[in-house]
Every structure is written in C-alpha cells, then in structure tokens.
Amino acid sequence: MTYTLKLYEADTSEAQRNAAERRFRDALETSLGDESLVAPVYSAYQRIVATYGEAPAPDSLTAAEREVFDQWQAAEAAALAATFGPHRYMGDAMYEIGV
C-alpha cells in the first residue's frame, strides 16, 4: 500500500517544499520502520481516532490499538521535527497524507 504526501507551507519555493517533503517522508518511514508501513499504520490510526477521538483514554484502547496510536504519534512528531524544526508549532505549515 502506497501513500502520497503534500506539504502546505506559505512563502516557500517548489524546491524548498520538495526538500521538506523528502525530510518528512524520511523521518516518517524511519520511525515506522519502512515505507510500506506508513499507509497501513496511518489508516489504522485514522480509524482509532474516528472511533475514540484525538485523545482517547488509555483504558479505552486495546493493547494493539494503543501500540498503533503511540507509534503513529511518535512517527508524526519525528517527521514534523525533521521538517519544521523547533518552530513546528508556529505558523501555517500543514500536511496531508493520502492512502
């Protein structure tokens, strides 16, 4: 299963955006272990969030759901840090993953 990635960042050139997308992909794939794991883990994470919300109570998830939830959040944090650095919580930069 493959995935697409699109970064939305104001005031960047196409070359800068492409480089940022590569950093995001590299960090995400490294954190999850392989490119082939991004789409299924993200899809599972999306189902968990749709069922339990953005911040589910720890005891509401099964062990497997908690593992997927935690893995995705860690991978996402690593990708955001690699892409946007210490200012990742400031500004209008956003991303979209398609599966």
Features from the language model and the residues they span:
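Short, extreme N-terminal segment that most often corresponds to the first beta-strand
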Residues: 1-23
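Hydrophobic beta-strand residues in large extracellular and virion-surface proteins
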Residues: 3-7, 24, 28, 50, ...
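A structural detector for beta-sheet-dominated domains
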Residues: 6-8, 53, 98
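Amphipathic alpha-helical binding modules
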Residues: 76-99
